[in-house]
Amino acid sequence: MNDFYYSEKPTSPIREKEFAVAWKNKELHFISVSGVFSFDDHLDKASRLLIENYVPSGNMVLDMGCGYGAIGLFLKALYPQLVLTLADINERAVEYAQKNAERNNLWVNVVKSDLYAALNGNRYHDIVTNPPVAAGKKVVTQLIQRAK
């Protein structure tokens, strides 16, 4: 069976890649992992673009489809006042997002959730995402429509 980064329970062998990302006066160290977006030894371009251009509109922020946590964790490092929740359906993503938060001494809430199902109706000022386009139009549409 092939695993996709939006698989709930990846079964592929675990392979890790470590790398650092620097932006402004911050440097974070990440472990990316197979079966999770984006398994590589560097930050993907879309995530970097989002991080570099994000301006908070409030303090409650959700990183939906967080993968190993790069976007949400970097935003927490840049804006420590944010109350950040990182959510992903992928169990391995949730595990590595938590590991990456700990290795960078960042306090965030990491939740396993199928879109918004496990978020208890919480409200957020901002929802950031590098949307899981490979999951298909239906999933991406639900991600947007349920954000209201």
Regions found by a protein language model. Name each.
Residues M1-K24, V36:
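N-terminal auxiliary segments of SAM/dcSAM-dependent transferases
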Residues T141-K148:
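A short glycine-rich, Lys/Arg-flanked "PGG" loop and its adjoining helix->strand segment in the class I
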Residues S32-D41, L49:
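Class I SAM-dependent methyltransferase Rossmann-like catalytic core
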Residues H42-A46, V139-V140:
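Residues at alpha-helix caps and immediate loop-helix transition turns in enzyme cores, especially N-
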Residues K26-S32:
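A short, charged helix-loop
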Residues A46-T129, A135:
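Conserved SAM/SAH cofactor-binding pocket of Class I
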Residues T11-P13, D44, E102:
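A generic structural micro-feature
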